[in-house]
UniProtKB/Swiss-Prot annotation:
This is UDP-3-O-acyl-N-acetylglucosamine deacetylase. One of its GO terms (biological process) is lipid A biosynthetic process. It comes from Azotobacter vinelandii (strain DJ / ATCC BAA-1303). Zn(2+) binds at residues 78, 237, 241. The gene is lpxC. Catalyzes the hydrolysis of UDP-3-O-myristoyl-N-acetylglucosamine to form UDP-3-O-myristoylglucosamine and acetate, the committed step in lipid A biosynthesis.
């Protein structure tokens, strides 16, 4: 059978919060079967746990934020994208601050951490959510859709009228049965416009943002000396974000997601619309891994 997965070992990292600019201590820990991904604010007394579920999303302005009462965890999407890409079902994410560290602005460092900790299969069936019919949400000219698909596919289109984007690929469609999340998506960094960063900083946001953890674009060009990691890094980062946002369903998806100018808010609206329409999806497991439309990298020993 396709089994649930957790981490083999505990692993720690330190980074800065994108918005606070302050140091954050991150610890990833194994968790029992059926726990899911749980964010844990260990700087609070008592400690507060917030499960990574669509219904716990409270803010979506600049990132996806989980909220429980007056406690929050910002910027969960890149870490969740890494968890989804490596098929991690159960883990505790301990944080010393209200924000996941931004690292280099991609999911790459989180993939490295998880692979360094090692993957541990557990004695329980992995559950998938299979899309049975189309579910769509729209807002102005933005659109997000789930469609049936025998596998996991993410298609995205961005539309920026800006010199850096003109003539550059603004669409991408990735079928993960034939494309590696780790190689082709995980290293795509978040991006921002210099004018927006200046505005955000004046409101005490993006205080930790820099060319070390984002692609920064001015009126005419990319300011990062090393340029882009992928020719289509901008749209691939939107795919990375979407994968993280979709993992708030609590299970891996069998289906296709299509986004046109979608962001964290619309992605979350789509999840909630899907969960409300119980005839649009079903939970499935696979006793025979060969019959499954999705496969994951084999667990590797911790190094």
């Amino acid at each position: 059978m396709i089994k649930q997965r957790t981490l083999k070992n505990i692993i720690r990292a330190t980074g800065v919060g994108l918005h606070s600019g302050e140091k954050v201590y991150l610890t990833l820990k194994p968790a029992p079967v059926d726990t899911g991904i749980v964010f844990r604010r260990i700087d609070l007394d008592p400690v507060v746990d917030i499960p990574a579920r669509a219904e716990n999303v409270g803010e979506t302005t600049m990132s996806t934020t989980l909220v429980k009462g007056d406690v929050k965890v910002d910027t969960v999407e890149h870490l969740l994208s890494a968890m989804a890409g490596l098929g991690i079902d159960n883990a505790y994410v301990e944080l010393s601050a209200p924000e996941v560290p931004i690292m280099d602005g991609s999911a790459g460092p989180f993939v490295f951490l998880i692979q360094s900790a090692g993957l541990q299969e557990q004695e329980a069936c992995k559950r998938f959510i299979r899309i049975k019919r189309e579910v769509a949400v729209e807002e102005d000219d933005k659109r997000a859709v789930f469609l049936p698909f025998d596998g996991f596919k993410v298609s995205f289109e961005i539309d920026f009228d800006h010199p850096v984007f003109r003539g550059r690929t603004q669409t991408a469609s990735i079928d993960f049965s034939s494309t590696s999340f780790v190689k082709e998506v995980s290293r795509a960094r978040t991006f921002g416009f210099m004018r927006d960063i200046e505005f955000l900083r004046s409101h005490n946001l993006a205080l930790g943002g820099s060319v070390d953890n984002a692609i920064v674009v001015d009126e005419n060009r990319v300011l990062n000396e090393d340029g882009l990691r992928y020719e289509d890094e901008f749209v691939k980062h939107k795919i990375l974000d979407a994968i993280g946002d979709l993992y708030l369903l609590g299970n891996s998806l069998i289906g296709e997601f299509r986004g046109f100018k979608s962001g964290h808010a619309l992605n979350n609206r789509l999840l909630r619309a899907l969960l409300e329409q119980k005839d649009a999806w079903e939970v499935v497991t696979f006793e025979d891994a060969m019959s499954a439309p999705i496969s994951y990298v084999r667990p590797i020993a911790a190094v």
